[in-house]
Amino acid sequence: MSEHTIAHSITLPPGYTLALIPPEPEAGWEMLEWRHSDLTTVAEPVTFGSAPTPSPSMVEETNGVGPEGKFLPLTISPLLHKTSRKALTPTPSLSPLTSLACPNSGIGPRERSTSTPIPSAGTSSTLTQRVLQSLRAPSASTRRSLTASSSSPSTQR
């Protein structure tokens, strides 16, 4: 059997999926696999890595998110077909020119651009200033929506 069995699959934003994969039938839940596919250019999903997960009950409680609501840090690796300790070693699967970057990693394919340079440190755009102001002083409607959507007061600022 070269294909792994996905016992539970959770749908995330377009192009992202999350799957819990049992490495051995008797071993229980051990792996959390993130996959991302660029729907416009890549036919096969690109795996961003696998990492040990907490117990299944903890994963269910956090809806697929790591402890304390944080996503697990993962590295780029090929799609894992047979889960073993050796399979956790990341190896590049795409050429540098066609590789995709992990979300929020800051690393990815470089493209030549004719756009204007980024302003030097110490200057900021009006848009950035407006965003910062809106984050500092949320409106009454924002506070209401935070209160309505949050069950713990620690998420309100």
From Swiss-Prot:
Biased composition (Polar residues): 114-132
Residue ranges with Low complexity bias: 88-100, 134-157
Chain intervals for the UniProt region annotation (Disordered): 46-70, 83-157
Protein name (database record): Protein p17
Native source species: Helicoverpa armigera stunt virus (HaSV)
